[in-house]
């Protein structure tokens, strides 16, 4: 009987090289994107995030549930989604890892846009889905950096990057502000609204990504069909 009003999805890693998960997938792919796809599917299909679209337990106007994805403006200009290699594990090093971080932020934002589309009908928002970039944050995301760089990066982070408390303020706004009631598919760079990379908004990309994501997880989890939402 548990219901959530808000889901803030923030998990992310920045490993210095490719690392396989126990499912045989790339860690940055599984943590930074696929886990968020699976979690949203499960919470929506089971009505834990109340919605009329998939679970038939939608909230009345003025009480719209909210999903907020923490992303990065580094997605701007990232490579288009490669569906031939989507979900395929292969080895790479530090330089490619930086590109992969930005790439999977583009993937995440494309998914968020498609999810927002599916959760509204004829101008009525069933569940709002918004994305934000907190800017540079003094966090431990570089904890796996090579030892020779870790101390230097820690110094740079502490001097020039925002504290987690300041970085969380736009998240609190998206979570609780009455100004955001019923608004969906917005992107905030800190507190500033802006456009995401234009590739994110292509409807055919969103549909292809949804189908590809579901296919990857069905190969891993034989129970996936019980909670993954329709590919349509």
Report residues per predicted region.
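Non-transmembrane alpha-helical segments in soluble domains
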Residues: 112, 116, 172, 210, ...
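C-terminal, well-structured subdomains that either form a transmembrane helix-short loop-helix hairpin
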Residues: 128-144, 160-170, 202
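Rossmann-fold NAD(P)H-dependent dehydrogenase/reductase core
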Residues: 1-140, 227-228
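C-terminal helical subdomain
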Residues: 155-195, 201-205
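A glycine/serine/threonine-rich, flexible loop-to-helix segment
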Residues: 84-85, 138-155
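Short, hydrophobic alpha-helical segments
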Residues: 47, 175-179, 217, 221
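Charged catalytic carboxylate motif
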Residues: 107, 166, 208
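Intracellular terminal tails of multi-pass secondary transporters
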Residues: 202-232
């Amino acid at each position: 009987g548990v219901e959530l009003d808000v889901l803030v999805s923030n998990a992310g890693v920045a490993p210095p090289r490719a690392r396989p998960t126990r499912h045989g997938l790339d860690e940055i792919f599984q943590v930074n994107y696929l886990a968020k796809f699976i979690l949203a599917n499960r919470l929506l299909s089971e009505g834990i995030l109340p919605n009329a679209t998939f679970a038939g337990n939608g909230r009345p106007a003025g009480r719209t549930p909210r999903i907020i994805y923490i992303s990065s403006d580094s997605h701007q200009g990232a490579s288009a989604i490669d569906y031939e290699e989507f979900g395929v594990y292969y080895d790479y090093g530090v330089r490619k890892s930086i590109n992969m971080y930005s790439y999977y932020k583009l993937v995440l934002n494309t998914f968020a846009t498609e999810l927002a589309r599916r959760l509204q009908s004829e101008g009525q928002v069933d569940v709002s889905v918004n994305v934000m970039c907190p800017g540079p944050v003094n966090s431990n995301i570089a904890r796996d950096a090579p030892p020779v760089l870790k101390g230097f990066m820690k110094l740079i982070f502490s001097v020039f990057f925002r504290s987690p408390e300041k970085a969380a303020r736009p998240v609190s706004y998206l979570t609780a502000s009455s100004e955001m009631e019923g608004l969906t598919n917005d992107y905030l760079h800190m507190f500033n609204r802006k456009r995401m990379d234009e590739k994110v908004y292509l409807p055919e990309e969103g549909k292809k990504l949804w189908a590809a994501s579901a296919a990857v997880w069905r190969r891993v989890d034989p129970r996936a069909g019980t909670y993954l939402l329709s590919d349509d």
